[in-house]
């Protein structure tokens, strides 16, 4: 199982208000040249959404947020993993290796593409990132 593994950071921010607030938020970062590796948006309650943003450049993101008067929660640690084959058991294998290294995954998200590759984001504690990379590269 060949994996491409990248340590990344993520930030959380909650937006409230009317329809279109998410678009305004994402535009703030697009306008300063932030490229998002991934994102997640989850409704917390009516008209309140938490965005989890995974920038390729955390400094650009924090600078853009500061200029726009936005308060980001983060940075937090994560791993972005790309696999070439979404065969049955690929995710189980990743979790097994992390379990054997005594690494707790706080949260994860994944997706497969139509060509058979997949991606997964593992939300980890900062102190577990290097250990997780080592465990997965074995």
Tell where the protein language model's regions lie, with residue ranges.
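A conserved regulatory-domain signal marking ACT and ACT-like small-molecule sensing domains
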Residues: 1-138
